[in-house]
């Protein structure tokens, strides 16, 4: 995997590599995500988007998108991370590469407020359409019937 990562670093000079407990994590700027993911899928065999999620770091004013990719033929796994501005979290949609990203991106939009330009139908998926806020953000406050 070392040669593979070195090749990616040559193609994407802003790519940061972090060793993980289980798999390496590639940290890439949001404007390079689509190009990196296209490379990983079309040229490196990572044909399966296992999942994506968002993590809220309010103390750092960022939301981190985390993607887990699998190469089924190559029996390999890799993690890709993107740090987003917490006030305006936005990262390109991956639905054109992996149609399964559709529902997962809608969930991240609904629960964390991340926008995905290029998504074919970005709208709430779990909360009602008139719901205010994003309930998985750490600063989200529940209101009781008494208003507290």
Curated annotation (Swiss-Prot):
It is an enzyme of class 7 (translocase). The keyword Aminoacyl-tRNA synthetase does not apply. PANTHER family: NADH DEHYDROGENASE [UBIQUINONE] IRON-SULFUR PROTEIN 3, MITOCHONDRIAL, NADH DEHYDROGENASE UBIQUINONE IRON-SULFUR PROTEIN 3. Its EC number is 7.1.1.-. Belongs to the complex I 30 kDa subunit family. This is NADH-quinone oxidoreductase subunit C. It comes from Moorella thermoacetica (strain ATCC 39073 / JCM 9320). It catalyses: a quinone + NADH + 5 H(+)(in) = a quinol + NAD(+) + 4 H(+)(out). NDH-1 shuttles electrons from NADH, via FMN and iron-sulfur (Fe-S) centers, to quinones in the respiratory chain. The immediate electron acceptor for the enzyme in this species is believed to be a menaquinone. Couples the redox reaction to proton translocation (for every two electrons transferred, four hydrogen ions are translocated across the cytoplasmic membrane), and thus conserves the redox energy in a proton gradient. One of its GO terms (molecular function) is quinone binding. NDH-1 is composed of 14 different subunits. Subunits NuoB, C, D, E, F, and G constitute the peripheral sector of the complex. It comes from the Bacteria. The keyword Transport applies. Pfam families: Complex1_30kDa. It is found in: Cell membrane. It is a peripheral membrane protein. GO terms for cellular component: plasma membrane.
